[in-house]
């Protein structure tokens, strides 16, 4: 008899009756891995906190649900095929059951009205009345299968709607949203969510929004199943909108949450925006929000927390800390004028990434062309001097801007972030008739190609420096007020070291407003290298193009057997002083882009040792700069160069073969392979050059086979 009693005690352990949760918490709970780990998930921002990595069981717990009535989490131990519950200490207690199937496990479950529901595709919908546990935690509860429940939908989780009492889940294969009758198990197709995958965790909030977490990438999607959206639901319009992009990914996911709680606590630790809701500001609109990390903010004062966005005429500046205006950390030094650059000072509390949008067309959204003005720009702690380009078609008037600063990248103007701050402000824009003109077009690039063996032809492959090149000029009242030069380094097929610069012929450097001009390398602001001591404005993009690349090939992007991505881009924003320069006094595009010898390096036989800036190669018939050594290079009669300053002939042979080319075509030009003469790669080029450009003007459209680099 004693042996029998001991056997019964071992097979049915006594429940310690851990304390339930004190409240209906807003946090979502995510159960992952074996042995199970319990994570707290902020559904608003996507941040996660490990709450417990030892539940007292070396097992996986799945099919979890929160019981609002007794405030326990119930789940299914997939390792040992038994039911468990967890209180606020997250220690799992085994529940005594009868009728629990032993031929399969459960991964789908939730609790509603004190009944635990379990589901398995192909097996059915099961119920467990939990009320016996109210008076005796060691009571045995009965597992019942709902007769006739079809269980055909492939689910990995479902959740109860807090208002209508139905279960909802997404078919992993089709992305279809289904509702389930908890009494009969009947399945009703509602509509296509537009997303597929293993949705291992599902949660509702008190407003009727359904949140699902996808195991593969951790993204959290939200579906509007609120009563206010009844018309769309009835019509099957139930898209799953990406709500958080950085949730926790796992092969074993299940979630539980008190569906009667809002997703934002009254003691919120989240910053929201302030613009009108047409810009997607409120949480219901998936507006921008940042979990306050105590480290990352704009301005001098940390932001305060909000329960939701403050939509105009309300404003966050009237509640708590004025972190949107006086302390917002955003200062426009120059006005926002259409087509021009505006200097803006951004004060950051620490390093991080800035993205920003301005509604140029004033249509109440930030999704227009050119409305994202900064993308993942890396800020330093303290003041950062930046420039943004005002869209040429921006409308005059007051509009909205949104700045987001975070430790995350790839943020949009909506959605959650686990760190930082969002600042929405109104800005004034002026458009007083500025117009733009382009070279070669608004979106295309010309190709610059250089041979650096001048004054010798050598291999004449015209790929020692290849750059893509574009210019945008802004004009007002018959004057050029701004020029922007964009470029990309496409190839370096040189053994010699070369720099690259652009001269604006006849433009006195004093006419450049240096404080309002800038240079970027790979999207990052760097020093504006306007050469000192010159009579004309010369901007040095790079003293050594080779330093701008890292290649595993013999040369960079000149062999089809060794292809690499582009690595270096640049932009020069040149603002002219005063009212600008009259178009009659302004030089024609494409200006004068040229290469020069990198200072301190050898550049070929019979040349001065380490010629540096005294050696240049320009486009044909373009005179060199004042830095060029005319005496030792032109007048010495070196190589095959036939330059003659008295006749205006520069950088061409006696047959008119140049050492530099600029090609404008609908498609970006493909330059010759390494050691392939351009005449071999493009046979019609010879007659084009020797005719002075009169014949074969489309020579670049007729390449020989297998003789050019094909990106």
Tell me what each language-model feature is.
Residues 33-34, 76-78, 119-122, 172, ...:
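Short loop/turn segments immediately following the C-termini of beta-strands
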Residues 47-55, 90-99, 137-149, 186-193, ...:
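A short beta-strand motif characteristic of beta-propeller blades
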Residues 19-20, 58-66, 100-113, 150-159, ...:
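Repeated scaffold domains used in trafficking and secretory/extracellular systems
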Residues 43-46, 86-90, 129-134, 181-185, ...:
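Short loop/turn segments that connect beta-strands within beta-propeller blades
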Residues 23-32, 72-75, 115-119, 166-169, ...:
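Conserved beta-propeller blade signature
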Residues 19-49, 272:
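An edge-strand/N-cap motif at the start of beta-rich repeat modules
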Residues 535-711:
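A eukaryote-biased signal for long
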Residues 262-463:
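A broad "non-catalytic interaction surface" signal
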């Amino acid at each position: 008899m004693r042996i029998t009693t001991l056997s019964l005690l071992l097979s049915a352990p006594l429940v310690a009756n851990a304390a339930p949760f004190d409240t209906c918490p807003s946090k979502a709970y995510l159960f992952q891995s074996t042995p199970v780990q319990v994570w707290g998930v902020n559904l608003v921002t996507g941040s996660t906190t490990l709450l417990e990595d030892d539940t007292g069981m070396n097992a996986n717990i799945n099919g979890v649900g929160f019981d609002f009535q007794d405030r326990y989490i119930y789940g299914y131990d997939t390792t040992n095929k038994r039911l468990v519950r967890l209180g606020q200490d997250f220690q799992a207690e085994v529940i005594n059951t009868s009728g629990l199937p032993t031929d399969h496990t459960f991964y789908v479950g939730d609790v509603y009205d004190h009944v635990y529901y379990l589901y398995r595709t192909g097996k059915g919908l099961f119920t467990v009345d939990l009320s016996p546990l109210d008076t005796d935690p060691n009571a045995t509860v009965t597992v019942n299968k709902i007769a006739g429940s079809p269980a055909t939908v492939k689910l990995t989780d479902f959740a109860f709607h807090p208002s209508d009492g139905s279960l909802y889940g997404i078919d992993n294969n089709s992305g279809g949203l289904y509702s389930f009758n908890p009494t009969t198990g009947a399945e009703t197709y509602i509509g296509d969510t537009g997303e597929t995958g293993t949705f291992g965790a599902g949660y509702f909030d008190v407003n009727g929004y359904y949140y699902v977490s996808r195991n593969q990438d951790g993204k959290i999607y939200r579906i509007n199943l609120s009563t206010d959206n009844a018309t769309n639901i009835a019509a099957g319009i139930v898209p799953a909108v990406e709500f958080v992009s950085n949730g926790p990914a796992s092969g074993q996911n299940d979630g539980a949450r008190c569906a009667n709680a809002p997703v934002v606590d009254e003691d919120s630790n989240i910053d929201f925006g302030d613009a009108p809701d047409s810009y997607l500001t409120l949480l219901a609109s998936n507006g921008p929000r940042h979990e306050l990390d105590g480290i990352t903010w704009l301005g001098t004062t940390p932001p305060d927390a909000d329960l939701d966005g403050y939509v105009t005429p309300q404003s966050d500046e009237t509640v708590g800390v004025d972190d949107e205006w006086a302390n917002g950390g955003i200062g426009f030094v120059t006005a926002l004028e259409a087509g021009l650059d505006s200097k803006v000072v951004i004060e950051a509390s620490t390093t991080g990434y800035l993205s920003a949008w301005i509604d140029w067309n004033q249509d109440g959204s930030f999704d227009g062309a050119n409305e994202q003005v900064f993308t993942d720009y890396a800020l330093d702690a303290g003041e950062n001097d930046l420039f943004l380009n005002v869209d040429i078609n921006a409308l005059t008037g007051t509009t909205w801007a949104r700045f987001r600063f975070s430790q995350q990248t790839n943020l949009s103007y909506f959605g959650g972030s686990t760190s930082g701050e969002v600042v929405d402000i109104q800005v004034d824009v002026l458009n007083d008739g500025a117009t733009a003109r382009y070279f070669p077009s608004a979106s295309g690039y010309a190709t610059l190609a250089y041979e650096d063996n001048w004054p010798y032809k050598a291999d004449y492959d015209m790929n020692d420096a290849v750059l893509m090149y574009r210019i945008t000029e802004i004009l007002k009242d018959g004057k050029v007020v701004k020029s922007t030069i964009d470029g990309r380094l496409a190839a370096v097929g040189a053994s010699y070291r070369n720099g690259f610069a652009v001269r604006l012929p006849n433009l006195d450097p004093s006419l450049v407003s240096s404080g309002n001009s800038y240079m970027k390398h790979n999207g990052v602001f760097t020093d504006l290298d306007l050469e000192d001591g010159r009579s004309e404005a010369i901007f040095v993009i790079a003293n050594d193009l080779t330093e701008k690349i890292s290649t595993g090939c013999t040369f960079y992007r000149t062999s089809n057997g060794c292809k690499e991505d582009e690595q270096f881009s640049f932009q020069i924003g040149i603002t002219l002083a005063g009212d600008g320069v009259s178009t009659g006094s302004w030089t024609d595009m494409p200006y004068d882009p040229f290469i020069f010898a990198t200072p301190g390096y050898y550049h070929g036989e019979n040349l001065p040792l380490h010629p540096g800036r005294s050696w240049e190669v320009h486009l044909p018939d373009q005179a060199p700069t004042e830095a060029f050594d005319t005496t030792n290079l032109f007048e010495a009669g070196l190589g095959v160069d036939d330059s003659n300053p008295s006749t205006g002939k520069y950088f061409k042979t006696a047959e008119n073969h140049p050492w530099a080319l600029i090609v404008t075509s609908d498609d970006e030009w493909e330059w010759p392979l390494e050691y392939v003469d351009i005449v071999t790669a493009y046979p019609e080029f010879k007659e084009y050059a020797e005719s002075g450009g009169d014949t074969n003007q489309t020579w670049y459209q007729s390449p020989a086979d297998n003789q050019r680099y094909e990106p």
